């Protein structure tokens, strides 16, 4: 078969017409130095602050320092095989993570990739890790409670939906335990939870996940993990990733709870990055913007109004407010709350729960110090019954602490003082609670009612715990309907007061403990 010249030229023209060229313009640069997870890149003229830079091997770095003749970027992941002279490209994208309901019940890394071996995740889209917090007009005041299930917290330091409540204390004082119990208590409340583990041992995180699974709480929880073995960049970014996942629910008119465990380790990771980028160090060698590091994160936890939710969902969700409640954790050194990072976070948050090692070692657990623990906005969110019954508890404890210090020096005390001391000791004993045993509002109310109305007067100190257990078992057995009513309404009136009094009178007359 022979082709003549016209056929050949026609064939060539046809092929040229069909040839599809897609031109891609990439701003390309060259790595000029690699050290400790930081790369310096020359030639990226148009790069943005916080932009993802594509590296060889399907990895990314984030541009943090934009200098005159080079860009300082932090590598997300392994960097040992990166070398001078390698080509890198701008992506034009800010770091985004997958968000959506598909993440519930899963364990993911900072980038939202599954690390639990349960297969891929079906997400509802992507969200930028850095987002601007809702404005003043878009917010609504906090007036609904988040029940932690702890008597001492829900009575004296109540937390509301959309609040930021700091959990602060030395190592091994029960900070994580309190946060995990708060997640377990949300099983049936409809609040979605996000647990962000920053710089922790992988074995510790595995234990937390196992406990959540045992108590059926993992199904409505997202666990975001940046372990101690991961790069400083991933530890620094983990809280922002978790926050973006929590905001998905907030912006759609739902309630979410996020725990940052802990922000001290995030600040240390950020300090490491900043020093390697040669930013000037400030107090305790932290960079100057370490306050902004935490404030821009914690301001994203808020209660947003129905108009904001309606506008965000383009009218799909109407008449619903959304909230993201944050429980950041800070570890102190030898109880020093006046150090740089603790004071920063105390000033950003709406209150703090201070856990003390001396109380913990004395067997008072949760080791909450009611003297310097405070909730600045949670009082408005407390249920009526808890508000009414918890008033005397804080006063009783404050008087007890004052008298206990005084009684060490006084040999003979009058009867009134002895009575107050005894009552304070019993209330302290009553507020003790085992881990993984959160209590409902009705159970807490019944116990607080007993303390408030003097039913502990003739109970021996050593038997307060067994008195409480027997009382709750009796109420569950004989008065389940009343407990259910209190849990549903949270109301307190003369009728409920009379019924609670009746339960306690009957219990003390007929039961033993």
From Swiss-Prot:
GO biological-process terms attached to the record: proton motive force-driven ATP synthesis
Keywords: ATP synthesis, ATP-binding, Cell inner membrane, Cell membrane, CF(1), Hydrogen ion transport, Ion transport, Membrane, Nucleotide-binding, Translocase, Transport
Site keyed Required for activity: positions: 373
S-S pairs: none
Matching CDD domains: ATP-synt_F1_alpha_C, ATP-synt_F1_alpha_N, F1-ATPase_alpha_CD
Transmembrane segments: none
Subunit structure: F-type ATPases have 2 components, CF(1) - the catalytic core - and CF(0) - the membrane proton channel. CF(1) has five subunits: alpha(3), beta(3), gamma(1), delta(1), epsilon(1). CF(0) has three main subunits: a(1), b(2) and c(9-12). The alpha and beta chains form an alternating ring which encloses part of the gamma chain. CF(1) is attached to CF(0) by a central stalk formed by the gamma and epsilon chains, while a peripheral stalk is formed by the delta and b chains.
Protein name per the record: ATP synthase subunit alpha
Species, as recorded: Yersinia pestis
Gene field: atpA
């Amino acid at each position: 078969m022979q082709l003549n010249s016209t056929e050949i030229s026609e064939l060539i023209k046809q092929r040229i017409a069909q040839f599809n060229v897609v031109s891609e313009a990439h701003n390309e640069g060259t790595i000029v130095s690699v050290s400790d997870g930081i790369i310096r890149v020359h030639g990226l003229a148009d790069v943005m602050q916080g932009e993802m830079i594509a590296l060889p091997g399907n990895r990314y770095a984030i541009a943090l320092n934009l200098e005159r003749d080079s860009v300082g970027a932090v590598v997300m992941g392994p960097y040992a095989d990166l070398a001078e002279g390698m080509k890198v490209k701008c992506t034009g994208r800010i770091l985004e993570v997958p968000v959506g309901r598909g993440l519930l019940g899963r364990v993911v890394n900072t980038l939202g990739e599954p690390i639990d071996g349960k297969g891929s995740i079906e997400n509802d889209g992507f969200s930028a890790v850095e987002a601007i917090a809702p404005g003043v007009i878009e917010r609504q005041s906090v007036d609904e409670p988040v029940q932690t299930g702890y008597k001492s917290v829900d009575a004296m330091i109540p937390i509301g939906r959309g609040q930021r409540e700091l959990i602060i204390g030395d190592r091994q004082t029960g900070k994580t335990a309190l946060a995990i119990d708060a997640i377990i208590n949300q099983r049936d409340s409809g609040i979605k939870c996000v647990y962000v583990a920053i710089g922790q041992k992988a074995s510790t995180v595995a234990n937390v996940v196992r406990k959540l699974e045992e108590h059926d709480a993992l199904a409505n929880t997202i666990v975001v993990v940046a372990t101690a073995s991961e790069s400083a960049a991933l530890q620094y970014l983990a809280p922002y990733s978790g926050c973006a996942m929590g905001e998905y629910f907030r912006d759609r008119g739902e309630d979410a709870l996020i725990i940052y465990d802990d922000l001290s380790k995030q600040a240390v990771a950020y300090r490491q990055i900043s020093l390697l980028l040669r930013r000037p160090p400030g107090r305790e060698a932290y960079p100057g913007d370490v306050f902004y590091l935490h404030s821009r994160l914690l301001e994203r936890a808020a209660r947003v109004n129905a108009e904001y939710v309606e506008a965000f969902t383009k009218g799909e969700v109407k008449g619903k407010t959304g909230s993201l409640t944050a429980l950041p954790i800070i570890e102190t050194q030898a109880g020093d709350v006046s150090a740089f990072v603790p004071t920063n976070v105390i000033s950003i948050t709406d209150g703090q729960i201070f856990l003390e090692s001396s109380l913990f070692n004395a067997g008072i657990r949760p080791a909450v110090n009611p003297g310097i623990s405070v909730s600045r906005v949670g009082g408005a969110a407390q249920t009526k019954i808890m508000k009414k019954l918890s008033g005397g508890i804080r006063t009783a404890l404050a008087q007890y602490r004052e008298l206990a210090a005084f009684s060490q020096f006084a040999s003979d005390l009058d009867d009134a003082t002895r009575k107050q001391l005894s009552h304070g000791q019993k209330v302290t004993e009553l507020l003790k609670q085992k881990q993984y045993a959160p209590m409902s509002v009705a159970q807490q109310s019944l116990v607080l009612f007993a303390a408030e109305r003097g039913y502990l007067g003739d109970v021996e100190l050593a038997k307060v715990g067994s008195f409480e257990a027997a009382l709750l078992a009796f109420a569950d057995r004989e008065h389940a309907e009343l407990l259910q009513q209190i849990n549903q309404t949270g109301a307190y009136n003369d009728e409920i007061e009379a019924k609670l009094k009746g339960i306690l009178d009957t219990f003390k007359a007929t039961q033993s403990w």
